Amino acid sequence: METAPLEAIVKAYGTPCFVFDEAALARRMHAVREIVGERMRLCYSVKANPFLIPAMCGLVETLEVCSPGELEICMALGVRPDAILFSGVNKTWRDVERAMDAGVTRFTCESPLHVRLIDEAAQSRGRVYPVLLRLTAGSQFGMDEADLLAAVA
């Protein structure tokens, strides 16, 4: 970034303000893509910074949302529902239904409750939705081995 444009931004918006170099972001994301190739899909977690959603849409295949608010922001910005992964440990029946109604087709399951919520909502629509089961590594998030095995049984 050049000093002159930054000075103009400070005059226009004051301080503090956040300024992102989208060209630098794109270069870094392309470097990551070169390293991982096409064998992996890149995912941006919206909670990191929702203001970067428009820039990230062209750089990653998936946007992870963890709340109804993040989902609404993505919908308002025109993010394709098939590019959204609905995640989060506090999902409710209403959240899952809203996401499905919006066209979201991929979900994470962090608990046996999430498995039931998503399964019941899918069945009520006569659909099958792919899910990612989150296995805990000893933290408070995710399912332990027994819960995970029960989920796939």
Per-segment meaning from a language model:
Residues 1-129, 133, 137, 149:
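A charged N-terminal "starter" segment
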Residues 137-153:
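Active-site loop/helix belt of alpha/beta enzymes
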